[in-house]
Curated annotation (Swiss-Prot):
Name recorded for this polypeptide: Ribosomal lysine N-methyltransferase set10
Residue positions binding S-adenosyl-L-methionine: 234
Organism encoding this protein: Schizosaccharomyces pombe (strain 972 / ATCC 24843) (Fission yeast)
Gene Ontology terms: cellular component: cytosol; nucleus
Subcellular location(s) per record: Cytoplasm; Nucleus
Domain of life of the native organism: Eukaryota
Length: 547
């Protein structure tokens, strides 16, 4: 620390007279072994530390220096340029302008790229684990590009050194907008200023003096009592970002989140149309649907997620309704159908539940034995807690938001049974002829018994066609389903018709023989309903009659 202080002050840095860097006694210090402590009370609005622009490590300086080796560094990725520059500066030793600063920097880190196999056991199945693998791949590619640009790279310019340099930037960098007001933001290093530890919500002012001092300044915003540590505030960062970038976590981080990525099937119906709606209305890309579940469940955030999922899961009929609505309104004012609401909530629950289940199943059954494992466990445990809290919240939200639909019935399942096409219709007197035929083949018309046969889909197609044959007598209207989907024969529908013809139509002519409805066109129609409109709820398939 003495070398850094001497070098920093020589290069124009300023340090409040009551600030002293002392050896930390905290075994779990977020950064190195020194902390800044107030030797006397420090009033608000006092300059704590400053770093001149000239002493900062910036992209412009790195680029100009590396262009001496190869002019092609002019157009090189700024991250590669910065990491290569710092790595090469570290090899200069005492000849470097930043020798004292580089000597002070940690020689190793607690970020996931420094984890060994035992450490990684605490990260398995987390987003940070896969993010670390991706980062390693990117940095390998960057290192290879740096080697190709260097005319005569020394053997000491290793990939490990590049990782070290890149981690210095991820753990200590500031934005270049502090120095260059009107340029595109790139990372910069501010020696001495970056020595303060992070504390969420810490009032601190970052000031840039472009006139007199030409320096970046950290200014106190509240009294710092004698003996207290001075902190910086990196902003509202969750534990995943802290672990990946800085190598530590906060046990009760108010800004912690879980990143939830929704995978879209490549054969999603109406994919292009849905992508356009999401991009135009919500600025979401269908190919990269990423949501952040907060530590404290937030209704507004979940509503935004559900709006997006209502588009993703929309049936053909719902998509037409949504498209018409968007001619005069926006997605926020759109009220999905009951099917759309349930489907969105079910999909969200499925994703959250599967993430939580994955983390719980891969949870190490041993206690952490290293600092890295401690941070990883804090991160992992917090992810599990957020997911479990989100599951509870979504279930309660689902109950509250749908309750007005099914009241005065006791629950949603009963409402669906009474207002949907499902195998529960086999208990209705109107379906007695069909029930006898199904019971002859399957030995039962009990809903749970039929689900257990794994032939619920084929039975649903049959029930849909039967509903068409008695549509005027049904306890609910299926007119929107009839109007919304054309009864046109298609190859898949013809194939299903042949199966039903052999299983039912030919064997039970007393039920199906006299009706004109049991044909290839209507089976194709029913297949569309099952593929596009069906909803799985409590293990049963329902096709809700739209209203």
């Amino acid at each position: 620390m003495e070398k850094l202080l001497h070098e920093a002050l020589q290069n124009g840095c300023k340090l409040h007279k009551s600030v002293e860097f002392i050896q930390s006694r905290d075994d779990n210090a977020c950064f190195g072994s020194y902390i800044a402590v107030a030797q006397n009370d420090i009033a608000p609005d006092q300059l704590l530390i400053s770093c001149p622009f000239e002493y900062a490590i910036t992209y412009n300086k790195a680029k100009e220096e590396l262009k001496k080796l190869n002019p092609n560094f002019e157009s090189c990725n700024p991250h590669i340029t910065l990491c290569t520059f710092l790595a090469l500066e570290s090899l200069k030793g005492i000849q470097s302008k930043w020798y004292g600063y580089i000597e002070y920097l940690p020689k190793t880190f607690n970020t996931p790229l420094y984890f060994n196999e035992n450490d990684n056991a605490f990260l398995i199945s987390t987003n940070a684990y896969s993010a670390a693998q991706e980062r390693l791949h990117i940095w390998k590619h960057e290192y290879q590009e740096a080697l190709s640009l260097h005319p005569s790279p020394t053997e000491r310019f290793t990939f490990d050194l590049y990782i070290w340099s890149a981690t210095v930037f991820s753990s200590r960098c500031f934005s270049s907008n502090l120095i260059y007001k009107d340029s595109e933001s790139t990372p910069i290093l501010l020696p001495l200023i970056d020595s303060l530890n992070h504390k969420p919500k810490q009032p601190i002012l970052w000031n840039s003096d472009f006139q007199d001092e030409k320096s970046v300044q950290l200014i106190s915003q509240e009294l710092v009592a004698k003996g207290n540590q001075l902190f910086n505030n990196y902003g509202p960062k969750g534990n995943e970002e802290l672990l990946m970038g800085y190598g530590f976590c906060l046990p009760d981080n108010p800004f912690d989140t879980v990143t939830l990525k929704v995978a879209i099937h490549p054969d999603l119906p109406h994919k292009d149309q849905k992508a356009a709606i999401l991009e135009n209305d919500c600025q979401f890309q269908l190919s990269n649907l990423v949501f952040f579940l907060p530590k404290s469940p937030d209704k507004e955030i979940f509503q935004k997620i559900l709006q997006c999922l209502a588009v993703v899961t929309a049936s053909s009929l719902e998509l037409r309704k949504l498209t018409a609505h968007l001619l005069t309104g926006d997605l926020a004012s759109y009220v999905p159908s009951l099917r759309g609401q349930i489907k969105s909530l079910e999909v969200l629950l499925m994703y959250i539940d599967s993430r939580a289940d994955l983390l719980l199943k891969s949870n190490p059954q041993v206690s952490p034995t290293s600092e890295r494992q401690v941070w990883a466990k804090i991160y992992r445990d917090s992810q599990i807690n957020i997911l479990q809290d989100s599951i509870t919240y979504v279930k309660n939200y689902m109950e509250e938001s749908l309750q007005k639909t099914y009241k005065p019935l006791p629950n949603l399942l009963q409402y669906l049974i009474l207002n949907s096409i499902s195998i529960f219709l086999l208990q209705h007197p109107l379906f007695a002829p069909l029930s006898h035929a199904i019971e002859s083949l399957y030995g039962s018309t009990d809903a749970e018994a039929l689900v257990a046969t794994d032939e619920q889909d084929i039975l649903m197609i049959l029930i849909c066609v039967y509903c068409l044959s008695i549509s005027e007598k049904l306890p609910f209207s299926i007119s929107m389903l009839v109007e919304g989907y054309p009864a046109v024969a298609n190859p898949e529908g013809v194939e299903v018709f042949e199966i039903l013809d052999e299983m039912f139509f030919q064997q039970f002519t007393n039920v199906f023989g006299e009706s004109k409805h049991f044909n290839k066109e209507n089976v194709s129609w029913a297949l569309q309903l099952v593929n596009d409109e069906s909803l799985d709820f409590s293990g049963f398939t329902f096709i809700i009659a739209h209203n």
